[in-house]
């Protein structure tokens, strides 16, 4: 193989050796790289040729276009293409590809190149390449792009919000904020809130009033029932008082009769030598006086009986009248519908079916409460009169009972002295 090729000046014989015949200790040549669309490679094809050779088998061809250059090597060479946006180095079997983007570059070193120069400084490892300051700027990640988009659109949204806020707030000619729309809108909103608050308050007051009227009606009905029951009890008590007074009058009569018999018994119980002879003169007068006394006694008894009956009758009449008045007032229905319709508008903000029903029920409850109050007044008046009448009769009974007690005590003492 050495005979086929002649050694030329400036060309290393090792560069024409096959890969198998190359020295195993050949160091890795330095990588090729490009910056800004120009080729910067100290060990590229120009270093191995005296002149620019094109289409050589093992030579190199440099074709520079408008935006870069293209180096085409043979089977073991490399091709560097510089386009408008970067470069691409295509090597053969033992080559590497360098891709340059818009900004910076990337380097892929060629290791163990059999055609590299012997006199180039060997590279110990791939770390030597990585130690070089890389000017390649890696492509931004998706998170970085999302952050940048958010920043961009956030600024746009902030600007739009500022513009919309500025547009919605009216300004006067002097640059100050106007009150034609903003304050009018706020005032309208506040008025709506006040109206809603008033409506809710009216509704609450109506419900409270309805509940109060229902409770008052229930309590008034209970009071009426208790008043009627009390009046009925007073009627029964009047009858009992009249009966007690009648029995007291009868007891008084028996006490008077016992007094007479005790006096007669005393006369008959005298000594047997004391002869009792009635006086012969004045007999008619004595008889007339006795009859007058008995008549007066009977008249007093009759008067007491009549007073007792009058007391019972008047008491029953008062009770019956109170009952009749109560029933009559209960059956009477006041027609206040027209007045309620006229006055209802003063208490309604937005009348509807529910509101009308509430107002109607409130009016009805108030009417019933008024009627119940009237009936309760009648019951209270009748009850007061009945209690006063009973108190008077009870006072009379107290006096009669005291006199009867005195008469009974005297009769007992008279009988005790008879022996």
Curated annotation (Swiss-Prot):
InterPro entries membership: T_SNARE_dom (IPR000727)
Biased composition (Basic residues): 1-11
Segments crossing the lipid bilayer: none
Residue positions where Phosphoserine is found in the record: 141
GO BP, one annotated term: intracellular protein transport
Region (Disordered): 1-60, 116-143, 156-186
Bias kind Low complexity: ranges: 36-60
SMART domains attached to this UniProt entry: t_SNARE
Key words of the record: Coiled coil, Phosphoprotein, Protein transport, Repeat, Transport
GO molecular function: SNAP receptor activity; syntaxin binding
General function of this protein: Has a role in cell separation, a final step of cytokinesis and in the assembly of the forespore membrane. May have a role in the transport of secretory proteins to these growing sites.
Protein name, entry field: Protein transport protein sec9
Organism annotation: Schizosaccharomyces pombe (strain 972 / ATCC 24843) (Fission yeast)
Lineage, opening ranks: Eukaryota, Fungi, Dikarya, Ascomycota, Taphrinomycotina
Gene it is expressed from: sec9
